[in-house]
Amino acid sequence: MKGLTLSTLSLLVCAGLSAQPNYDYSTIQREKLGRGVVCIRDNDSVTISWRYLSTDKANTAFNIYSNGKRLNPSPLVSSTFFRYPAKDKTTKYSVVPVIDGKETKEGKADYTLFKESSKPYISIPLNRPADVQIDSRMCQYSANDASVGDVDGDGEYEIILKWDCMGHDNSHEGVTGNVLIDCYKLNGKQLWRIDLGRNIRAGAHYTQFMVFDFDGDGKAELMMKTADGTKDGKGNYIGDKDANYVTNGYINKSIDGKMEPHKRYVSGRILSGAEYLTVFDGETGKALKTVDYIPSRGNIAAWGDNYGNRVDRFLACVAYLDGKHPSAVFCRGYYTRTVIAAWDWDGKELTSRWVFDSEKTDSINRITNPNALPYSGQGNHNLRVGDVDGDGCDEITYGSMAINNDGTGLYTIGMGHGDALHLMAFYPDSTSLQLWDVHENKRDGSDFRDARTGRIIFQIKSDIDVGRGMAADIDPTNPGLEMWSSSQRGYFDVNGNHHNTSTFIPQNSAVWWDGDKLRELLDRETITKFNWNTSRCEILKNFRDEGCAFNNSSKMNPCLSADIIGDWREEVIVRTRDSKELRVYTTTIPTPYRFHSFMEDIPYKISVATENVGYNQPPEPGFYFGITNNE
């Protein structure tokens, strides 16, 4: 555990946790977060919540003021949550740190709750794009996936929001509207809009956008795939603004090198033309640097088919590959060939760190071992990042395989493609990370494995496509986390024991919402809590009843869920059904616990950055967080 600062360890110890990844927090590049104060009206009271930071001393307490009047009789030490009876009037609330009995201005923060702010969420009015005509019919834009980053260096997060219009899955033909990317402050101010242009198709697998402070200047950048005709936040075009590579017509269809007897309609796909990778200024949306996307399409059929399905399967992530600085990683392909390219941005130049090509790796491995398991065809619709081998640098888990921080293969288990992937410490006393992975091949089902070696701890085989899987601590009567999938009712504990339930447990996402250390379930526009006594899920929050909607069809995910403001628990960012408003919901349920912000944990922060990628997965920390045996 060398390199972990005392304040970082205090988070792990106070939560009954153990350290897994071996980051050197004294040298690693990290963002500087502010206090994150948020005030929400809840019936006849106001809930005030704020961050406990790793820079706070362990004995830091807090006082709360309302228009200069102290509200708490004694300094608050057990949590960073406070509720106070209040009327509907404009009020300035202040959170003031107290150290050794004395108030300090350092770390003090204010929040003005206006009289008209009478709803239990932060409301952000959206600049919904105008309807567009596609194939002779009018189509509406819908707010979709989001990410967060401190783009202006004030210590608080802004929201980067993607807009889709008539988005399509890669397997479906059809013209789409242009993909748009907006940036909003939490006070509702829109900072910019980027238009990716007609040569970037709309859909869950095309635009994976990374928001992170890559160059360490204290402000987050935005990095994503672009094309000729992309217009940045300043109105400047990338490449040829008049280029049009959108296909229209039929081709002779081939899959896995075999020609099919019928033609394939490919209207709306982008099968040719320049492909770029661009880094944008997070505060202005200005394009700072554009390079050729690695890898290029090349021979489209070499990716598994010739009609644009497999060639345009993209993933992306952020990883501390050198243990100190965040790199952007952009990927292409997972059904057959996979190419993963790591990039570094220093504020001036975007340089390639390394490129992993599964075909080249497989060819080399088979020279010495003809039966070597392949790295090709192992990717999921998502990926996970963390220091799985304890060297202080991040590795990338790409479905059924893992890539070392130097761009070489770490291991492959050869179980192929899947739809869900979870990387955490599953055991209360664990000194390593584990993975829960589900597979589509109607053979391998689900596997629970060691994240460093790929060693299978246990496997639940299945003769169906296991399309969903989740892992979280939902039952305090079992040691460690629980895991489950769409293949059967019930859940498994870390020892592989099956616990049956009468119904399926929600499988898409999870959120820390109420006051305990168990995790709640986030799926189908509701937050539910698993009742281990009745083996049923009980609704805590129904966003649908409040006029909100989740995204991406069966994926049913909010725009984002993450710990972005307030205490250690997570917020849920959702759109209204008409996409005219974005709402940031934060819990108003009291908690007796005080933990540091999850965003100060490197794996958690990275998983928030990658949450918008492919099939959205919930953010997960790099340490055990849950009920321990002594509770």
Tell where the protein language model's regions lie, with residue ranges.
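Bacterial Sec-dependent N-terminal signal peptides
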Residues: 1-22
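Surface-exposed loop/turn and intrinsically disordered segments
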Residues: 23-29, 43
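Beta-propeller-forming repeat regions
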Residues: 27-34, 52-57, 75-631
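Structural beta-strand segments of beta-rich domains
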Residues: 35, 44-48
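Long terminal accessory regions outside catalytic cores
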Residues: 39, 48-49, 95
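Short, ordered beta-strand-loop transition motifs
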Residues: 40-44, 322
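Solvent-exposed loop/turn segments flanking beta-strands in beta-repeat/beta-sandwich domains
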Residues: 53-67
